[in-house]
Amino acid sequence: MARSSLFTFLCLAVFINGCLSQIEQQSPWEFQGSEVWQQHRYQSPRACRLENLRAQDPVRRAEAEAIFTEVWDQDNDEFQCAGVNMIRHTIRPKGLLLPGFSNAPKLIFVAQGFGIRGIAIPGCAETYQTDLRRSQSAGSAFKDQHQKIRPFREGDLLVVPAGVSHWMYNRGQSDLVLIVFADTRNVANQIDPYLRKFYLAGRPEQVERGVEEWERSSRKGSSGEKSGNIFSGFADEFLEEAFQIDGGLVRKLKGEDDERDRIVQVDEDFEVLLPEKDEEERSRGRYIESESESENGLEETICTLRLKQNIGRSVRADVFNPRGGRISTANYHTLPILRQVRLSAERGVLYSNAMVAPHYTVNSHSVMYATRGNARVQVVDNFGQSVFDGEVREGQVLMIPQNFVVIKRASDRGFEWIAFKTNDNAITNLLAGRVSQMRMLPLGVLSNMYRISREEAQRLKYGQQEMRVLSPGRSQGRRE
């Protein structure tokens, strides 16, 4: 009897192990060896020149029917070193971002507005379907089914894996502002360290190109010319056979007479399958409640993975100081899909004249975009030299390299930012305040490090009682 029970237990263990292995193999976004960060990023072919960092403004602006897009320079030394790309979309009401995919994973921060989006996950079913009985009773001859439509709002962090097509639509009455971060040195990108966008429709201008490539095109007289979508390069007869359509529809598919860009204005009603409003609100409530629950790895499949997390709400703060501000983070612990794309993010809010304690990121670069206000920022390199000491204003981007130490102090207007990290579990190491490097060192080590008395070492170690977000004023947070 004991042998039979042992045999049954072993068979069950083998079966469960096989099931788990199969689940892991089903995910096309899973990469092996996630513990070693360097294995997942291509190294820059040239040495990084980081002795003079600059707060970057967009270098180009392209306007279209329902949008204007601003692009930072891909050829910039700092962006090339980090292997990142930044874009800002401003989409007008009823603007539709046409479906497309890119060669690098992206994070999108919703800085303003709300809307809906669709993301076509390979191999997943079209779970939104027309009610045939209702359509027939209404006299409609059309039926539709598609993958899930996902709402988003201000403060959301959206994830778009490499090679996965997605679209977005502005449902609000005001502009929708999206901050787009692309990790072009991610292991998912097998081409080159430049962002390439592949569109399924329209004739979009390739504004993502770097300045060097743009200037080469200008000398050839092709700057500003629209390129085609991915179907425009195929022969008509191939497309006719592939889609079982006629030549007239093929020409529309290829966009031969279409002068629209990447985002178009929807004049008529935008019809997609969406849950009823009350059902959507109930679902949103369940989503908010379940968002903080722990994941066990079996509750989500690749087709139902959460692809967003709101990091703008104050109740989600990971660090909070009622006089200084707050910081919220999104990593693979809170949003499991980030483990697949190897990225994370941080949302920060500093009140007037508050400060972020000196710190560095252990295992990633940080690309900081200022969403509101301005701050004085200082960055120091491994030689103890200041590589940036200046103001970062709303709309600017500052790349902070891995292990470079940074301090931020907000102006009278306060300061807010979103920082994108090139690691799915970016680790911050503090140098002052609670849980900092100074607190971890013995007094004897501190006194000999700086040739100070034990009393001075005591003040240095325990003088700052706050953690990371510091209240305004030099005397704030000190022990009495």
From Swiss-Prot:
It comes from the Eukaryota. The keyword Metal-binding applies. PROSITE patterns: 11S_SEED_STORAGE (PS00305). The keyword Signal applies. Mg(2+) binds at residues 408, 468. Residues 1-21 form the signal peptide. InterPro entries: 11S_seedstore_CS, 11S_seedstore_pln, Cupin_1, RmlC-like_jellyroll, RmlC_Cupin_sf, Seed_Storage-Functional. This is 11S globulin subunit beta. It comes from Cucurbita maxima.
